[in-house]
Protein backbone atom coordinates (compact mmCIF):
# COMPACT_ATOMS: atom_id res chain seq x y z
CA UNK A 1 0.00 0.00 0.00
CA UNK A 2 3.10 2.17 0.28
CA UNK A 3 1.85 4.02 3.35
CA UNK A 4 4.47 6.04 5.18
CA UNK A 5 5.04 4.24 8.47
CA UNK A 6 5.81 7.33 10.57
CA UNK A 7 2.70 9.22 9.44
CA UNK A 8 -0.83 8.67 10.71
CA UNK A 9 -3.64 7.57 8.41
CA UNK A 10 -4.88 11.14 7.99
CA UNK A 11 -1.35 12.41 7.31
CA UNK A 12 -0.87 9.71 4.66
CA UNK A 13 -4.11 10.77 2.96
CA UNK A 14 -3.18 14.48 3.19
CA UNK A 15 0.24 14.00 1.60
CA UNK A 16 -0.68 14.48 -2.10
CA UNK A 17 -2.47 17.72 -1.20
CA UNK A 18 0.63 18.95 0.66
CA UNK A 19 2.61 18.65 -2.58
CA UNK A 20 -0.16 20.51 -4.42
CA UNK A 21 0.17 23.42 -1.99
CA UNK A 22 -3.24 23.02 -0.34
CA UNK A 23 -3.47 24.71 3.07
CA UNK A 24 -3.07 22.54 6.18
CA UNK A 25 -6.66 23.18 7.32
CA UNK A 26 -8.20 22.40 3.92
CA UNK A 27 -6.16 19.24 3.33
CA UNK A 28 -6.97 17.95 6.83
CA UNK A 29 -10.69 18.59 6.24
CA UNK A 30 -10.61 16.84 2.86
CA UNK A 31 -8.60 13.89 4.20
CA UNK A 32 -11.06 13.41 7.05
CA UNK A 33 -13.98 13.47 4.57
CA UNK A 34 -12.37 10.70 2.51
CA UNK A 35 -11.48 8.64 5.57
CA UNK A 36 -15.07 9.01 6.75
CA UNK A 37 -16.41 7.87 3.34
CA UNK A 38 -14.27 4.75 3.73
CA UNK A 39 -15.30 4.11 7.34
CA UNK A 40 -11.97 5.12 8.87
CA UNK A 41 -12.66 8.42 10.63
CA UNK A 42 -12.09 6.77 14.02
CA UNK A 43 -8.71 5.48 12.84
CA UNK A 44 -7.40 8.79 11.45
CA UNK A 45 -4.74 9.27 14.14
CA UNK A 46 -3.46 5.68 14.01
CA UNK A 47 -0.22 4.66 12.34
CA UNK A 48 -0.08 2.00 9.59
CA UNK A 49 1.33 -0.64 11.98
CA UNK A 50 -1.85 -0.22 14.07
CA UNK A 51 -4.16 -0.89 11.12
CA UNK A 52 -5.40 -4.15 9.59
CA UNK A 53 -4.63 -4.98 5.97
CA UNK A 54 -8.10 -3.89 4.91
CA UNK A 55 -7.78 -0.60 6.79
CA UNK A 56 -4.41 0.07 5.16
CA UNK A 57 -5.96 -0.62 1.77
CA UNK A 58 -8.77 1.86 2.45
CA UNK A 59 -6.24 4.52 3.56
CA UNK A 60 -4.37 3.97 0.28
CA UNK A 61 -7.65 4.27 -1.65
CA UNK A 62 -8.48 7.53 0.15
CA UNK A 63 -5.01 8.87 -0.66
CA UNK A 64 -5.44 7.95 -4.33
CA UNK A 65 -8.87 9.59 -4.57
CA UNK A 66 -8.23 12.81 -2.65
CA UNK A 67 -6.73 14.67 -5.63
CA UNK A 68 -9.75 13.77 -7.77
CA UNK A 69 -7.75 12.36 -10.68
CA UNK A 70 -9.31 12.00 -14.13
CA UNK A 71 -8.44 8.31 -14.27
CA UNK A 72 -7.99 5.72 -11.53
CA UNK A 73 -6.18 2.43 -12.12
CA UNK A 74 -7.47 0.13 -9.38
CA UNK A 75 -5.62 -3.18 -9.18
CA UNK A 76 -7.70 -5.55 -7.02
CA UNK A 77 -9.23 -2.65 -5.03
CA UNK A 78 -11.26 -5.02 -2.84
CA UNK A 79 -8.60 -7.71 -2.41
CA UNK A 80 -7.94 -7.31 1.33
CA UNK A 81 -11.44 -6.17 2.27
CA UNK A 82 -14.39 -7.94 3.85
CA UNK A 83 -17.55 -8.25 1.74
CA UNK A 84 -19.35 -5.27 3.32
CA UNK A 85 -16.39 -2.93 2.83
CA UNK A 86 -15.85 -4.28 -0.70
CA UNK A 87 -19.39 -3.23 -1.61
CA UNK A 88 -18.81 0.21 -0.08
CA UNK A 89 -15.57 0.72 -2.01
CA UNK A 90 -17.18 -0.32 -5.30
CA UNK A 91 -20.13 2.00 -4.61
CA UNK A 92 -17.70 4.86 -3.99
CA UNK A 93 -15.84 4.14 -7.25
CA UNK A 94 -19.14 4.00 -9.16
CA UNK A 95 -20.24 7.26 -7.55
CA UNK A 96 -16.99 8.97 -8.57
CA UNK A 97 -17.49 7.73 -12.13
CA UNK A 98 -21.11 8.88 -12.33
CA UNK A 99 -20.93 12.16 -10.42
CA UNK A 100 -17.42 13.41 -11.11
CA UNK A 101 -16.75 11.78 -14.48
CA UNK A 102 -13.67 9.88 -13.33
CA UNK A 103 -12.62 6.98 -15.51
CA UNK A 104 -12.10 3.92 -13.33
CA UNK A 105 -10.15 0.91 -14.62
CA UNK A 106 -10.55 -2.04 -12.25
CA UNK A 107 -8.36 -5.13 -12.51
CA UNK A 108 -9.92 -8.07 -10.68
CA UNK A 109 -10.29 -11.82 -10.59
CA UNK A 110 -13.59 -11.52 -8.72
CA UNK A 111 -16.62 -11.85 -11.00
CA UNK A 112 -18.81 -10.01 -8.48
CA UNK A 113 -16.51 -6.98 -8.58
CA UNK A 114 -16.28 -7.11 -12.39
CA UNK A 115 -20.07 -7.26 -12.61
CA UNK A 116 -20.28 -3.88 -10.84
CA UNK A 117 -18.55 -2.21 -13.80
CA UNK A 118 -20.07 -0.83 -17.01
CA UNK A 119 -17.71 -2.66 -19.35
CA UNK A 120 -15.79 -5.90 -18.92
CA UNK A 121 -12.65 -6.71 -20.87
CA UNK A 122 -11.77 -10.39 -20.58
CA UNK A 123 -8.07 -11.21 -20.71
CA UNK A 124 -6.78 -14.76 -20.93
CA UNK A 125 -3.10 -15.68 -21.15
CA UNK A 126 -2.26 -12.01 -21.71
CA UNK A 127 -4.55 -11.66 -24.72
CA UNK A 128 -7.62 -9.45 -24.81
CA UNK A 129 -10.60 -11.57 -25.65
CA UNK A 130 -14.19 -10.51 -25.42
CA UNK A 131 -15.20 -6.95 -24.54
CA UNK A 132 -18.75 -6.70 -23.26
CA UNK A 133 -20.98 -3.83 -22.29
CA UNK A 134 -22.39 -4.40 -18.81
CA UNK A 135 -24.70 -1.44 -18.23
CA UNK A 136 -27.34 -3.69 -16.62
CA UNK A 137 -24.69 -5.34 -14.41
CA UNK A 138 -25.81 -8.83 -15.36
CA UNK A 139 -22.72 -10.18 -17.12
CA UNK A 140 -21.66 -13.79 -16.93
CA UNK A 141 -18.32 -14.26 -15.17
CA UNK A 142 -17.11 -15.99 -18.35
CA UNK A 143 -18.53 -13.59 -20.93
CA UNK A 144 -21.68 -13.88 -23.00
CA UNK A 145 -22.51 -17.47 -23.80
CA UNK A 146 -20.68 -18.57 -20.67
CA UNK A 147 -17.38 -19.19 -22.45
CA UNK A 148 -14.17 -17.22 -22.55
CA UNK A 149 -12.72 -16.90 -25.99
Residue positions per predicted region:
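ABC family nucleotide-binding domain
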Residues: 1-123
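Conserved beta-strand-loop-alpha-helix hinge in the C-terminal portion
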Residues: 127-149
Amino acid sequence: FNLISFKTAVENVELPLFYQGVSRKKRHQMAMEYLDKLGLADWAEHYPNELSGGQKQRVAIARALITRPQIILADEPTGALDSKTSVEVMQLLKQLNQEEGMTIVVVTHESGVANETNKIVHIKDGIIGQIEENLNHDASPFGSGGLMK
